[in-house]
A protein has these predicted regions:
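Extreme N-terminal leader/targeting segments of oxidoreductases
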Residues: 1-33, 51, 91
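Conserved redox-cofactor binding core of oxidoreductases
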Residues: 2-13, 132-211
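N-terminal Rossmann-like FAD-binding beta1-loop-alpha1 element of flavoenzymes
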Residues: 31-58
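Short glycine- and Lys/Arg-enriched binding-loop motifs that mark or flank ligand-binding interfaces
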Residues: 33-38, 58, 96, 100-101, ...
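Acidic glycine-/aspartate-rich tracts in secreted/extracellular proteins
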Residues: 63-66
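Short, hinge-like loop/turn segments at secondary-structure boundaries
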Residues: 73-78, 195-197
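Redox-cofactor-proximal catalytic regions of oxidoreductases
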Residues: 76-155
């Protein structure tokens, strides 16, 4: 268990209303907007709506777990923080889907890789689904806003030997390669991002937009 300050525990002690966390919710709740899920989409949406003056309720299927709970044990993290104990798969069982089931959603348990939707993917969405407004130029200001909010920046730690070999191999093949962008502040490089960040370095929805 982390001995670092836990903003969630501090907030709860000061009276934050997290309904269903420590007590049963009231029979009726009133709000302007109900946001289902507290992950990347739900967290940012709820924050924008709340800043606009609307009363917002967030509904999350999974538990509220914070840095005080993250002990870097897969045996505890997987059944607690993931859908189907990290065993969710595609219908054909070919691909494992590591999907979060906790406050913060998958942003609580992902590995902080933060890249913009590739141009090729946007083009596919336009051609396949008619989403003509989704272009690099139209989305750029929204990406920039999210990157500022979540402190997305280049990973400053030098690559280890196997990743350096991958970079050199890509260079010899003429394939562009660079260090990934990550949404962290003061990362300790513990290597356990997938089990929740015990140091509050990961700028997930759990730490940024939801509180």
């Amino acid at each position: 268990m982390s001995k670092l300050p836990d903003p969630w525990l501090t907030g709860l002690q000061q009276g934050w209303a997290v309904l269903g966390h420590t007590s049963a919710p009231p029979t009726t709740l009133t709000a302007d907007v109900l946001v289902i899920g507290t992950g990347a989409g739900g967290g940012i949406t709820a924050e924008l709506l709340a800043r606009a003056g609307l009363r917002v309720i967030m509904l999350e299927e999974g538990p509220l777990k914070t840095s005080s709970d993250f002990n870097q044990l897969e045996s505890e993290a997987y059944p607690t923080l993931y859908q189907e104990s990290a065993a969710r798969k595609t219908n054909d069982k070919a691909i494992n889907i590591l999907q979060g089931r906790c406050v913060g959603g998958s942003t609580t348990v992902n590995w902080t890789s933060s890249f913009r939707t590739p141009s090729e993917t946007l083009a596919f969405w336009r051609d396949r689904f008619g989403l003509t407004d989704l272009t690099d130029d139209t989305l750029a200001p929204y990406f920039q806003q999210a990157e500022r909010r979540l402190n997305v920046s280049t990973w400053l730690t030098p690559p280890n030997e196997n990743n350096e070999l991958l970079r050199r191999g890509a260079a010899q093949l003429g394939i562009p390669a660079a260090a990934i962008l990550r949404n962290v502040k003061g990362c300790w490089n513990l290597g356990s991002c997938g089990m929740g960040c015990p140091t509050n370095a990961k700028q997930s929805m759990l730490l940024t937009t939801v509180p």
